[in-house]
């Protein structure tokens, strides 16, 4: 490739990064570049899958140890905002008890992010709903163990 083409591509990438950072803020931008906790857990203690009205699907996987979340991860087929929100939903659940997870909502995820475009705010609620589904799955399994 020519140096001119390489310079053009690099300049275009820099422009995209600057515009994305301006719209999403630094916290969401950094997580967009490096989404933490993305993946699947084999045999999770809790699993939640929710498809939003936008068509994005969010999956949350939880493993518990001594009553608290030991491992958490997410998978999505959605946009960058869904990826960012899924990453924060998984992160916020780590080390938490079921009662504490109940307090993780779309609003708390948005507060952590600082800002998200208005048209993408539903992604935080999609992530929180999937997290609550995973918690519900875990609680049902715990109840069955008691019987």
Model features per residue range: what roles?
Residues 45-50, 75:
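Short, solvent-exposed loop/turn elements at beta->coil junctions and helix N-caps
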Residues 54, 76-85, 123:
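Short, thiol/selenol-centered motifs that function as redox-active sites or metal-ligating centers
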Residues 56-67:
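Short beta-strand elements
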